[in-house]
Amino acid sequence: MAIDEAIFRETIKDKKKPTIRFYGWHPAAVSIGYFQDPRKELNIEQCNNMGVDIVRRLTGGKSVFHNDEITYSVVAGVGEKSFPADILGTYKVISDCLVQGLAYLGVKANLAEACRAKKDMDLRSCCFSVPSRNELLVAGRKICGSAQKRTNGGFLQHGSLLLTFDTVKALSVILPFSTSEHLAKLRNSVAAINEVIANPLETKEICNLLKKGFADVLGVEIVEEPLTSGEITLKNNLMKKYEDLRWNIERKKHLIPFRNRR
């Protein structure tokens, strides 16, 4: 989360080229949307017992259990030629990139339409319980959940692509209690890459094919680069925020303001 925000801030400040990043989580964690209250929507005691970290995202949306997955993040200026200026347009382009990448894996995905399903109130805090418009479905089941943040002419969108999904563990940390009905509902709502392809692939190979999907849809060459010195410095400062319970639990504001380049 600190790296995502550091890249986002530096892109806004220095008008950098778009960045696409893929990463995983260790140990397992639950990320919560910017506006969520984990004291009401998570089983914090169970998270602590299982060694599952809790971190608040800069983006909105609902709770996501991060375990065996690939998280992608895209950072760019609003109006950058590769992406439409509006939120839904940006979502769709990024989803098209992911659809193409999944196709290279042999996974046929499509975009969800608006209001295609009624939200289950018992599972309302769980991101994968229902798709939003332009999110990815495989055979009607959600395989990727995404959220976006915009400020000062830039956007950050990140999302989770499931490799496998442990329904029992996910519900045990997201819900105060769960029933067999909850488990069945969530299991029937979720798809995972290594469960829908004939032969599971190494994570690095999956990332390479997803990257190819972005390159082909956007018509660009993607060049691998390390973090800049400015991003590293900012990431180190932001780590204090993302390790702080006042941010993760209470959403206390951090002291590093967003700013444009002068």
Region annotations inferred by a language model:
Residues 23-24, 64-65, 137, 162:
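Well-ordered beta-strand positions
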Residues 25-38, 71-78, 96-100:
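Extended cationic-aromatic binding surfaces that line active-site or macromolecule-binding grooves
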Residues 1-45, 49, 53-57, 127, ...:
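Active-site loop/lid in soluble adenylation, ligation, and acyl-transfer enzymes
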Residues 44-83, 209:
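A glycine-rich, hydrophobic loop/mini-helix early in the fold
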Residues 78, 82-213, 245, 249-262:
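Catalytic beta-strand/loop module used to bind and position nucleotide/cofactor moieties
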Residues 32, 50, 59-60, 139, ...:
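Short glycine-rich loop/turn motifs that provide flexible caps or phosphate-binding loops at active sites
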Residues 37, 64-65, 149:
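Short, electropositive, low-hydrophobicity segments enriched in small/polar residues
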Residues 25-27, 49, 65-69, 131, ...:
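Short connector loops at helix/strand junctions that flank enzyme active sites
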